[in-house]
Amino acid sequence: MSSLSGKVQTVLGPIHSDQLGHTLTHEHLSMTFECCYCPPPAPQGALSDAPILMKNLFWVKQNPYSNKENLLLNQEIDAISEELKLFKAAGGGSIVENTTTGISRDVKMLKKLAEETGVNIISGAGFYVDATHSNSTRSMTVEQLTEVLVNEVLQGADGTNIKCGIIGEIGCSWPLTESEKKVLQATAEAQSQLGCPVNIHPGRNSDAPFQIIQILQEAGADISKTVMSHLDRTIFDETKLLEFAKLGSYLEYDLFGTEMLNYQFNQAVDMPSDNDRIKMLRFLINEGYEDRIVVSHDIHTKNRLLKYGGHGYSHILNNIVPKMLIRGISQQCIDKILLENPKKWLTFK
């Protein structure tokens, strides 16, 4: 294992896990998402290039990937800095920033935000989905990809000495591509060398998380230090969810605040409401999985920011936690989800 054993690595350097505080395990603070632009229907075509205004805000909320400006979160650093200060004032301590190669990771900006706000920021190493892989990435062997991941954690990312503290979010499509499979195998190998936390973005199919875990296990990953993201848009059947939970990864519900009629990336999915998410957390807790749950908002478009009438980074602390208590989830379980589980996950073995 690496010299980071027993520590958490932030963009400002290693810290003890007791310094984390309330932790959001899946956010973005500076990224671009043009890779996932969805052209709007012809009658609404002009809205794709329109600025985000009060009069079209509802449309943008329902069609977040069809407005080009909305996909450029990296333009809102000043607003995000102010939001992080509000997050800290609400009792927040740390944010895991899951932007990886392919969606404009900017570790220099993350360091600046950490210095300005006092929030611990943990950056992610690795690669997003195949659609963002460069020809160079696709041509790499598993061994070469492993070396990239290890170096981003031990040496620094993007030509800097600013180091990543997790591997992820590692992007997976459905069906999984050969390039993504190699990245998963490299992730497992790098994790076995480093003892580091891993975060996975599964494809949009309920079988995807199972396939990913199998590939990781076969390549030697530690599933107990792996988070499976986006379960709130991926597995809806309770029986299937329990089957997945038995595999031992952390179960991440990370779209709190996102409530929409149509999910643009998969029209077959009825995006759950926050009340639905809380019900699913309660179900998992009642089944004995309170030690494996983590939560977040996955803010990755402008409309989710307070500046644009969105829920912002403090939504879970300000609004979801009180509702969890109303719905019978104990403070002890809430503390596990927001404090203890992130500590265990983020600490290097």
UniProtKB/Swiss-Prot annotation:
Cellular compartments per GO CC: cytosol
Predominant localisation class: cytoplasm
Q: What does this protein do?
A: N-acetyltaurine hydrolase that catalyzes the hydrolysis of N-acetyltaurine into taurine and acetate. PTER also acts on other N-acetyl amino acids (Met, Ile, Leu, Val) and N-propionyltaurine, but at lower rates.
Class in the EC hierarchy, top level: hydrolase
Any GO BP: taurine metabolic process
Return one GO MF term: N-acetyltaurine hydrolase activity
A Pfam family annotated for this UniProt entry: PTE
Residue ranges that the Swiss-Prot or TrEMBL entry lists as coiled coil: none
Among CDD domains, the record links this protein to: PTE (cd00530)
Q: Which SUPFAM superfamilies match?
A: Metallo-dependent hydrolases
Sorted alphabetically, the keyword list is: Cytoplasm, Hydrolase, Metal-binding
State the name under which the record lists this protein. Answer: N-acetyltaurine hydrolase
The positions annotated for binding a divalent metal cation 2 are 169, 201, 230
* Stored PROSITE patterns: PHOSPHOTRIESTERASE_1, PHOSPHOTRIESTERASE_2
Q: What is its EC number?
A: 3.1.-.-
Record's subcellular location: Cytoplasm, Cytosol
Q: Where does a divalent metal cation 1 bind?
A: 26, 28, 169, 298
Q: How is the cofactor bound?
A: Binds 2 divalent metal cations per subunit.
Which source organism?
A: Xenopus laevis
Q: Which reaction does it catalyse?
A: N-acetyltaurine + H2O = taurine + acetate; N-propanoyltaurine + H2O = propanoate + taurine; N-acetyl-L-methionine + H2O = L-methionine + acetate; N-acetyl-L-isoleucine + H2O = L-isoleucine + acetate
Q: Which Gene3D superfamilies match?
A: Metal-dependent hydrolases (3.20.20.140)
> What are its cofactors?
a divalent metal cation
Q: Which family does it belong to?
A: Belongs to the metallo-dependent hydrolases superfamily. Phosphotriesterase family.
